[in-house]
Regions:
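Transmembrane-helix motifs of polytopic, lipid-linked glycan transferases
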Residues: 129-154, 161, 168, 193
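Membrane-interface transmembrane helices that cradle and orient dolichyl/undecaprenyl
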Residues: 153, 186, 191-210, 303-313, ...
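Membrane-interface alpha helices of multi-pass inner-membrane proteins
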Residues: 192, 207-223, 229-236, 253-258, ...
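Perimembrane helix-loop-helix junctions
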Residues: 35-36, 41-42, 228-253, 276-281, ...
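Signature aromatic-anchored transmembrane alpha helix within multi-pass, membrane-resident enzymes
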Residues: 47-54, 252-253, 361-394
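Hydrophobic/aromatic-rich transmembrane helices and adjacent perimembrane loops
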Residues: 135, 227, 336-374
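Extracytosolic helix-loop segments that constitute the early lumenal/periplasmic catalytic or substrate-binding loops
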Residues: 80-103, 110-113, 117
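Extracytoplasmic
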Residues: 382-499
């Protein structure tokens, strides 16, 4: 029996719940009327609102790290550490020191040359060049996410949403790396380009070996971005790709050849530096794991879609990628001194997963109940709320608080003043804030991280370290003024104390 709406009598669709009907009339009508200057469909208008909302969040959170980059302050200790080695490349000095010294370099070489070249091309100092390059890399990663989701899920638009969320969450939650002189983001951008190229070639049934070789290059820029190559190699083997053995063999040989070339160029110091002394334990993992709360919601949204679409290639690939990203993150957090950059692989995988989840929202069980439009509205709203739900609001304070703006200017003044005192000290000097010694023109003579790890692992004692410093004529500078970029970013504190 046919009803007036064309459905069968026994298959009448249930009436939407009262909340859903209210939602359609209230929120749905609002979305359709947001842009009244031109006749847009409901879908077009929703799409524009999604882009506007996530795009505004990305711009909002990027304002602070971009503004902060102008100041001569140490954003994070690795900033000055990287700048010192970039200076070494610029001046033709050794890049990998004597393993028995008090300094070490456990990063592969390409980033130091890349940043030094970038600075030379754009007439910037190495510190500023590294900061600028990290912002460029972040934007490139967002573009790569868009292209990757287009291949996996067939939607450039929803890929762009994943990219915008990635910009926002990184600028929001990784401020010691975004806009800082650190090679992690640029290395990940090279790796992300390799992933995009890999998927494009696999989709076209072409040999993905060139893309795997690009990933090898990325590994010599920054060596701990391992989730993407593990995912791609596993995918080739799982899908029994006819180029799998060739790709694995050639890329593996290229990686070994690269290591051999580095040993030839940098001599016997290279491997001992790369295999730096480090302590390991569950304590570091437990101290860091709470940081995953920031992407937990995104991972939940992705997982809900992936389980509903688990038979699709997109879901299976992202399951591999997220799984390896989580594995890489937890593994690295076992090492003492490892920070938020260990989760960058996982955040990138989550962003790709979010884009695919938006594209495939109509395939989920919840979509069958509330409709794909409402489901996507909920997803966008939830992601935005998680981004904003924090007392730490640097960008807001940048506009609201004179004291907040003045704090970094004051910190730069402190650093320059401290550097002027170090500059007149005779001989080699150790600075807790390495940028002070660098600004004073002093060489890099004590790596506090290496010294700390030597002490933790029992490879040195405080007495042996003191003896080495005395033998090298190293004096410790006692800082009296704050010289690191640690402005008070609590919005609640500002509200309570503004009068």
């Amino acid at each position: 029996m046919q009803l007036e709406d064309g459905t069968s009598a026994g298959l009448r669709k249930p009436s939407p719940p009262l909340l859903c009907r209210f939602y359609d009339r209230a929120v749905g009508a609002f979305l359709v009327d947001v842009i009244a200057t031109r006749p847009l469909s409901r879908t077009d208008t929703r799409s524009l609102v999604y882009v506007a909302a996530l795009g505004a969040a990305a711009v909002y959170f990027l304002i602070f790290p971009i503004w902060r980059g102008q100041f001569l302050v140490e954003i994070w200790p690795t900033e000055s550490w990287n700048a010192y080695w970039q200076d070494a490349v610029s001046r033709g000095l050794p890049l990998y020191p004597d393993p028995t010294s008090l300094v070490g370099n456990n990063y592969p070489p390409l980033s130091f040359y890349g940043v030094a070249l970038f600075g030379k091309l754009f007439a910037m100092g190495n510190l500023q060049a590294g900061r600028a390059l990290s912002i460029v890399a972040l934007v490139l990663l967002a573009i790569e996410i868009t292209g990757i989701v287009k291949i996996l899920a067939g939607s450039t638009f929803y890929g762009a949403l994943g990219g915008l969320w990635y910009l926002a969450i990184m600028a929001r939650n990784s401020t010691i790396y975004v806009g800082a002189d650190d090679p992690q983001l640029a290395g990940l951008a090279i790796m992300g380009a390799g992933l995009w190229w890999f998927l494009d070639r696999v989709a076209a049934e072409r040999d993905p070996t060139p893309a795997l070789l690009l990933m090898v290059v990325a590994g010599f820029w920054k060596h701990n971005n391992i989730a993407i190559p593990l995912t791609c190699i596993s995918w080739l083997l799982i899908t029994r790709n006819r180029f799998a053995v060739r790709g694995v063999m050639i890329s593996g040989a290229a990686a070994l050849a690269g290591l051999g070339l580095c040993i030839t160029i940098y001599g016997p110091n290279f491997l001992p530096n790369m295999l730096a002394t480090r302590s390991y334990g569950m304590g570091t993992l437990l101290a860091n794991i709470g940081h995953l709360q920031w992407i937990a919601l995104a991972l939940f949204i992705w997982l809900f879609w992936a389980l509903s679409s688990r038979r699709t290639a997109a879901a299976r690939f992202t399951m591999l990628h997220v799984g390896f990203g989580l594995f890489a993150c937890l593994l690295q957090w076992l090492g003492h001194g490892v920070s938020g950059n260990a989760e960058f692989d996982l955040i990138l995988a989550a962003a790709i997963g979010i884009g695919a989840a938006f594209a495939g929202a109509s395939d989920t069980l919840l979509s069958h109940r509330v409709g794909p439009d409402r489901l996507r509205d909920i997803m966008v709203a939830a992601l935005l709320l998680r981004l904003l739900a924090s007392d730490r609001q640097e960008t807001a304070l940048l506009f609201l608080s004179d004291d907040f703006r003045a704090s970094l200017r004051g910190t730069e003044t402190n650093l320059r003043f401290e550097a002027s005192k170090v500059a007149i000290m005779p001989g080699n000097v150790e600075c807790k804030t390495k940028l002070i010694c660098r600004q004073a023109g002093k060489p890099f003579v004590v790596d506090e991280f290496k010294v700390e790890e030597m002490l933790l692992t029992g490879k040195a004692t405080p007495q042996s370290i003191a003896e080495k410093m005395a033998a090298a004529g190293i004096t410790t500078f006692n800082e009296t003024l704050p010289a690191t970029a640690q402005p008070k970013a609590s919005l609640i504190y500002w509200l309570k104390n503004r009068h």
